[in-house]
Design a protein with these regions (language model features):
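Classical Sec-dependent N-terminal signal peptides that target proteins to the secretory pathway
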Residues: 1-25
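Small side chains
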Residues: 12-14, 36, 197
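Short helix/turn-capping signatures at newly exposed starts of structured segments
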Residues: 23-129
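Short amphipathic alpha-helical segments that mediate assembly, nucleic-acid/protein binding
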Residues: 33, 62, 66, 70, ...
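Long, charged/polar, surface-exposed segments that mediate recognition or autoinhibition
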Residues: 96-212
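Short, low-complexity, Pro/Ser/Thr/Gly-rich segments in the mature regions of secreted, periplasmic
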Residues: 238-255
Length: 255
């Protein structure tokens, strides 16, 4: 299992994104959300040479010095602490698709501190989270400009209100056997039902203060009939004020 995870991480974390899209540079103004679902598209464009080496994006360079540097970095990269969540009591447990966390070497020139990948088992979907140490507003502007999108902004309190109303609406819809109340709540707070940035720690739930979300309908491929939602979210790390988190992926629209 360790060898398999290491190979996946060093070659390209975006492989865990299944059928989304191969990571491409951000030079094209027509870049779509589907082409950028792995988040690494933005990361590779503005990132240090070291991360490009780790992600296997510089294998086309044949200079012996570069190859040597790449091997050295990949060794260092693979030695970083990697957490594999292996909880067989979880109803969504899947031995062949663990969640992984990679801590990148600390480097002032590289704002990305760690990358997490997660595959949802109970519902179809995957996501990538990138933990950044730079300014959240700068990240927001970069993504909006490069993808030609506009984030919807929410506060932590709005998300709490949404959850309370959503839970109540779910109960009412279960009683009625129809999706009426939940749709009304979603229309009031569009995008928020894909957000999962809360952190449970020390018996307490921590909610981000700033939340930016963009979402749109998504089809993974023509053979998959269910409706899906593709999303990008950007929010402050509620348990570490020096970081913000860029998350993107897709999930079944089963709510």
């Amino acid at each position: 299992m360790t060898c398999m995870i290491q190979k996946i991480l060093v070659t390209s974390i975006s492989l865990l994104m299944i059928h989304t899209a191969t990571a491409q540079p951000i030079s094209a103004s027509s870049l779509t959300l589907e082409q950028g679902l792995s988040c690494l598209d933005w990361a590779e464009k503005e990132l240090s040479f070291s991360n490009q080496l780790a992600l296997g994006e510089r294998t086309d360079i044949s200079t012996p010095a570069i190859i040597k540097l790449q091997k050295q970095f990949q060794q260092q990269y693979s030695k970083q602490k990697t957490t594999i969540i292996d909880d067989s009591d979880d109803e969504g447990f899947c031995e062949d698709c663990p969640e992984t966390t990679v801590y990148l070497p600390r480097n002032k020139s590289n704002p990305i501190q760690r990358i997490e990948t997660s595959m949802h088992v109970s519902v179809a979907g995957v996501s990538t989270s990138i933990y950044r140490a730079d300014d959240i507003k700068t990240t927001q502007q970069k993504i909006e400009n490069r993808l030609n999108i506009k984030f919807s902004r929410y506060t932590g309190q709005q998300f709490k209100n949404f959850k309370q109303q959503w839970d109540k609406a779910l109960d009412q819809d279960k009683d009625n056997g129809k999706r009426i109340k939940t749709i009304q709540v979603f229309q009031k707070y569009p995008h928020l039902k894909v957000f999962n940035g809360e952190v449970f720690q020390n018996q307490k739930i921590y909610t981000p203060k700033q939340i930016y979300i963009y979402s749109q309908p998504y089809k993974r491929d023509t053979s998959y009939l269910n409706d899906m939602i593709a999303f990008i979210s950007l929010y402050d790390n509620p348990v570490n004020s020096s970081q913000h988190i860029l998350q993107c992926g897709f999930i079944d629209n089963v709510f």
